[in-house]
Amino acid sequence: MNSITLKPIRYIEGEVNLPGSKSLSNRALLIAALAEGTTRITNLLESDDTRHMLNALKLLGVEYTLSEDRTECTVVGNGGPFHTKEPLELFLGNAGTAMRPLCAALTLGSGTYVLTGEPRMKERPIGHLVDALREAGAKITYLENEGYPPLKIEADGLKGGEVRIDGSISSQFLTALLMAAPMARGDMQIDIVGELVSKPYIDITLHIMKQFGVEVRNENYERFFIKGGQIYQALETFMVEGDASSASYFLAAAAIKGGTVKVTGIGKTSVQGDVAFADVLEKMGAKVEWGDDYVSVSRGELNAVNMDFNHIPDAAMTIATTALFAKGTTTLRNIYNWRVKETDRLHAMAMELRKVGAKVEEGEDYLTITPPVQLKHAAIDTYDDHRMAMCFSLLALDPVSVTINEPECTAKTFPTYFEVLESISSY
């Protein structure tokens, strides 16, 4: 097994240019592929997840050119849904941002498709999306377990109409349906069942659809109306914002052991909800400064928080490890959807925090964390989850070193993460 041991970091200071956002990169690639015209996408994230989307688009006949460093992609739009004569199997790894949106998009055209992925992908639910697509006229079959990939899609277009979708597990299901809805034959009304999680991710989807020429009427995140029979219109250039979830590690590091860290590529006008992570650090006691395209954080005396983190589930993971450096007991509430991510993150986080000496209570949808007087050295298991590896790297900010098992899992969103962290660290 591969592992790296991070030696104790004395001080953090510097500037980080963020890689492109995973959420925006894969949405932009798919919409550009469905659009009429050619779109140049800049600051694209180079990662496993985008690679899976690009491979799928190539198999679907989409033409694109990639720059040498794979951060710029010129996509020749298909001018509407995909039509294929031969049955196609698409392997999507563990990329939820490829699996869910493609599942919806492929129902719009014609052809037979099998969507599959890594073993963990087969444990990640997709039933709420499939139920909604079936209501809109899609023919989708589960090939192994009911409610989970792999799936077989026999595409013949979506009729539209009134569709209900459960919003309580993952916002990606609604994102997938929204992105496909304009190309249904008729108008679509989407009614949300249950409380919609991760609303800021829906804002990302609506923002990108609007840039490609499609308006959605949003009634308080309870009901959405989309006109059918539309085609997305290509953009000359679409610039992908920096990844706000990835920013969280560097900002937290500054709050714990700064100095000041400035991250560029996101700022006060960012469309990503995860920029609110900086507000949480400020609440804990760090000093935060905002610009249009940067956020900077400086060290402060950190105190525990008790908060609902439903709006920023990915960045909230970073708060769980930051809590080890705060005074008091931190409570993260309303984070059930951690359980259906790359791994069961609630359970994984509780297990690994206990290894370093924290007192942890793991509830169905919450976590309480009381830091120990002194952290213990531990070998942290990452569960093939990029965010586990990056969150626990913050433990190097303690005088005790930390070992991260299988650190290469950061390739999912941030292949150069450990090099970038080192570049702003003094030992």
UniProtKB/Swiss-Prot annotation:
A GO term, aspect molecular function: 3-phosphoshikimate 1-carboxyvinyltransferase activity
Ligand binding (3-phosphoshikimate): 22-23, 27, 170-172, 198, 314, 337, 341
Gene3D superfamilies per record: Enolpyruvate transferase domain (3.65.10.10)
Residue ranges the record marks as coiled coil: none
Annotated metabolic or biological route of this protein: Metabolic intermediate biosynthesis; chorismate biosynthesis; chorismate from D-erythrose 4-phosphate and phosphoenolpyruvate: step 6/7
Main location per the UniProt record: cytoplasm
Record protein name field: 3-phosphoshikimate 1-carboxyvinyltransferase
